[in-house]
Amino acid sequence: MNKKILETLEFDKVKALFEPHLLTEQGLEQLRQLAPTAKADKIKQAFAEMKEMQALFVEQPHFTILSTKEIAGVCKRLEMGADLNIEEFLLLKRVLLTSRELQSFYANLENVSLEELALWFEKLHDFPQLQGNLQAFNDAGFIENFASEELARIRRKIHDSESQVRDVLQDLLKQKAQMLTEGIVASRNGRQVLPVKNTYRNKIAGVVHDISASGNTVYIEPREVVKLSEEIASLRADERYEMLRILQEISERVRPHAAEIANDAWIIGHLDLIRAKVRFIQERQAVVPQLSENQEIQLLHVCHPLVKNAVANDVYFGQDLTAIVITGPNTGGKTIMLKTLGLTQVMAQSGLPILADKGSRVGIFEEIFADIGDEQSIEQSLSTFSSHMTNIVDILGKVNQHSLLLLDELGAGTDPQEGAALAMAILEDLRLRQIKTMATTHYPELKAYGIETAFVQNASMEFDTATLRPTYRFMQGVPGRSNAFEIAKRLGLSEVIVGDASQQIDQDNDVNRIIEQLEEQTLESRKRLDNIREVEQENLKMNRALKKLYNELNREKETELNKAREQAAEIVDMALSESDQILKNLHSKSQLKPHEIIEAKAKLKKLAPEKVDLSKNKVLQKAKKKRAPKVGDDIVVLSYGQRGTLTSQLKDGRWEAQVGLIKMTLEEKEFDLVQAQQEKAVKKKQVNVVKRTSGRGPQARLDLRGKRYEEAMNELDTFIDQALLNNMAQVDIIHGIGTGVIREGVTKYLQRNKHVKSFGYAPQNAGGSGATIVTFKG
């Protein structure tokens, strides 16, 4: 479609109304490239996508898409053989994450029938191995240590060397305190230095890196740390080299999939654009129109999207109707009506919703032409009439039966009699060529043309004679009146003068009376139509309310089932808690032996069911299935605390995972799902089995690192029981340093336990304050 009509109708401003609802740069780019098409299948597809997205929002009103940046240039660089930097990898990582989130959303979607949208969701790719590779880059733009073994080794050495430098400098701060201007370690030229008083500069051997402005302070790098600093500099160079190697290696792994990733990004943007259209529908009460096969247009309560508080109007352009001629005075809204028709058609043929009521229909036109406004050229010295006529001549040479033509103030700018005759001749030519046309004019002669000519219809814009203001209501089938006499009379002109004027045009009175009757009939019809629409709106509200109630009832059923399970679990927990209290009371009041108390406690636990049998509960089954690991899931390797991605499951049930550049084989118990870590509220109690270890007598170890407080205390209780049953003399409890909450809980527990003889922190080489050694009474 020609660009001039899009500029005339300000289509770019209309597209900008959708931008606030977009979440991705891909969607924004597709919106900006959006243009009307005459291909019916493309328009139908866009309409179907919007309707399906509306249905999706009914079930998932908070459906959203992760924001993504444009990656077309990144993928192009990959295809050309370039290696990517960290920032570019993060862009790809975000796209892959968004793709996976959308796939997961689609897999769990229920109660919605999708056809067009399903094609897009199902075309998204899953790259579990690439996702594992890209875990090497964290969101802060840092390459993780687990990206490669060599990088981890280098960074460990850097850390050790830096620790040595700090230790040496701290010792020197204490030893040379009287020689320093300040008791701090400074940094100069990337080196750690001491601020030495100038009078003592020869007392501390080392390299001078700087002198203060006053000359009183000399910044010296002590000789003891020079060699270490050089080692660190060398290691930093090795680190940079290894990071470049990692970037090159991952670039090579991603390169074969560049086109697929770019396609995924386009699909994400397309889904985002469809989502934005539906958000616009919700915000502006817009609709997806029906598509007419025969250029029939029926717009119900249509509004101009760029006009604030626009008056809604009905427009019906039947199959046989070739022209609608809007007559009447200026400033009544004729031009806005013209633009509303054209812009609504452009929006619909671009696959966008329109501001109208349900039941509206649009046609398909190969081209839309318009001559609107004063486009005269000062440089060409053209008059208003010449400017319009030049444009119209050009249009008449291009239009055909598949075009829509909009003409504003046809024949204006010249002698009224000649202008009216020319306007009628142009309209007649268009009628004979069966070209749909909407034209505005203030020539009264065209009223008769509209009445007498087949397939041509008059129309006007309503004017309120009581307030002397236009109402901007479109009155199809009713020719316009100037209302000059009524206006003059209300403004105070003498009735004698008005009477003389009306007598001079008595021959037109019959026509005016007919027009007045038509206006009254149109107003009556409009009132009836408004009443019908009110009833329809009430019905729609009731239908939505019933649907909402139905969905709420279903959700309440699921909630009740979950609540029943929680209540059952609470009862079990209460019973176990009461049994613990009973046993504590027995222990305090009697001389029962420890193993007898533990055996009694175990028997009580057996009385309580481990879980409530809700195997037939579909909601719980779905939740359980959702927690099960699957290919593509992000995981945390428990032994390393590093993130990775599951790439495949082996026949023996174990999983292969990509952790940075390292591929690992893991059992399910050796990793945890990232999503499960974030979402699970209740974890099944895990009991660490006490094992005897070789060495100095019987020993046992419990690792509580990474546990929640309640979980850690439960495991500690069970662990101590088992240690006593196995007659252990001593056990180790690893709780880490962290925030100190679990360490404090362990201390309080051991203080209360009467079977504990003593406890204390482990030696520095065995964990220090991160571990506690417990000795039991004999």
From Swiss-Prot:
InterPro entries: DNA_mismatch_repair_MutS_C, DNA_mismatch_repair_MutS_core, DNA_mismatch_repair_MutS_sf, MSSS, MutS, MutS2, P-loop_NTPase, Smr_dom. Keywords: ATP-binding, DNA-binding, Endonuclease, Hydrolase, Nuclease, Nucleotide-binding, RNA-binding, rRNA-binding. It holds the Pfam family MutS_V. GO terms for biological process: mismatch repair; negative regulation of DNA recombination; rescue of stalled ribosome. ATP binds at residues 328-335. One of its GO terms (molecular function) is ribosomal large subunit binding. It is an enzyme of class 3 (hydrolase). Residues 702-777 form the Smr domain. Its EC number is 3.1.-.-, 3.6.4.-. Homodimer. Binds to stalled ribosomes, contacting rRNA. Endonuclease that is involved in the suppression of homologous recombination and thus may have a key role in the control of bacterial genetic diversity. Belongs to the DNA mismatch repair MutS family. MutS2 subfamily. PANTHER family: OS10G0509000 PROTEIN-RELATED, SMR DOMAIN-CONTAINING PROTEIN. This is Endonuclease MutS2. It comes from Streptococcus pneumoniae (strain JJA).
